[in-house]
Swiss-Prot record:
One of its GO terms (biological process) is translation. Signal peptide: none annotated. Keywords: Ribonucleoprotein, Ribosomal protein, RNA-binding, rRNA-binding. The lineage of its organism: Bacteria, Bacillati, Cyanobacteriota, Cyanophyceae, Gomontiellales. Belongs to the universal ribosomal protein uL14 family. This is Large ribosomal subunit protein uL14. The gene is rplN. The keyword Cytoplasm does not apply. Part of the 50S ribosomal subunit. Forms a cluster with proteins L3 and L19. In the 70S ribosome, L14 and L19 interact and together make contacts with the 16S rRNA in bridges B5 and B8.
Amino acid sequence: MIQQESYLNVADNSGAKKLLCIRVLGGGNRRYGSVGDVIIATVKDATPNMPVKKSDVVRAVIVRTRKAIRRESGMSIRFDDNAAVLINQDGNPKGTRVFGPVARELRDKNFTKIVSLAPEVL
C-alpha cells in the first residue's frame, strides 16, 4: 500500500536507487497504490554518471509491497520491501534488467516486458 510521501526501492538498473512517491495515478483523488499501479515519483538517491539523476520526476510501476496482496484463490503474498521499476510514457521499462521477484499481477495489468525481465515471478 503506497501513498503520497512513501519511499520505495528501485528494482532496475536505470540509475535510481530510492524514490519518493508524489502521486498515485488513476482516479481523481486516489489515495493508495498497490502492485501494478503507476505512480509519479521523485528520485531521492541515484548512481553517478547514469541517465536518471537525483531530483528527476519519473513514472514508475509498483512491483513489490510489504502490504499483503490477496488473490482470488484465497492465497496472500507479501514482500520484504516496497519496490518499483521506472517506466517511460509508453509503459516500457527504462532499465534493461529487473532485480528481485515481482508479483504475477503485473502480467494482468499489461506490464509483460517487466515480467519477462524479472528473474522470478511469484
